[in-house]
């Protein structure tokens, strides 16, 4: 039986990976045409700082980067280069740097930014959802639902702006500088990031015992993480609460209570396991929401990760950077959904693919 189940799972994974490849291809095609139909002229944006540039130079530059060609010809050239590992070179946001090199440089800061929310949000949201369901219609439930409403109603860019203003203009002033959070960028100007072994500041700080870099990096990550946690906490907490309320009405939960099982064991061993099945999909979807939310948090806190560069590339018309970043985000999101489906079988062995 186990061999049959393992074989079915393997076949399912192979099928899902093939579907992912097809979906990524369609994302690539759609992204190319949508970005190239944008009314943004990258050459004009780059040369607008110097109005004395002759028109002939402008035309030569358009020809050099290939934007003068018909869109379908550009598409064939890009696809050929893409599958050969050449994703193009940035023209605006990192002049001349290969897109793959740029992504390798800005991927670690974004992962560090979303790492704390990814770890804390599932733990906090499940705990809050259980507490809210357990104390339904009591003051504990009212407080938790109030926090949920805050996360649902307040956009992340607005909340991030409020947090930044509070930390820089109120908290710092009224504590006379004793409490001083860094409210922009990934590191302070006076902190040297020399030992770039992994590209992850926190990991490199641990490896090289750089206490100054570690403390500074954590201070810069803290405020954007708080904004992400408050906003993303809401959906998973709400889903956990609803699932727990449904499960706690089931006969097997009532039977466990009738047998004298402790309430703690009823919640953790009987109810929670089944309530986590729909919630696990929300938790995996958290990765997608955090990546999308990083576009706003990185812009507000001037944190130069994937979101910051994506926004800058859209503004400047740096097409190859836009496409490269969206493809990477798509791969992460699709991989996350695959992991969620596999986790279903771990949470509930009755699910067979």
Spell out what each predicted region is.
Residues 10, 107-108, 112, 116-140, ...:
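Alpha-helical transmembrane segments of integral membrane proteins
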Residues 8, 12, 32, 36, ...:
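Transmembrane-helix boundary motif in ABC transporter permease subunits
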Residues 24-76, 167-213:
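Hydrophobic alpha-helical transmembrane segments of membrane transport/permease proteins
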Residues 1-18, 258:
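N-terminal Sec/SRP start-transfer signal
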Residues 38, 151-154, 291:
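Transmembrane helix irregularities
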Residues 17, 57, 61, 71-87, ...:
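Hydrophobic alpha-helical segments of integral membrane proteins
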Residues 2-9, 67-126:
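An internal, D/E-rich "acidic patch" concept
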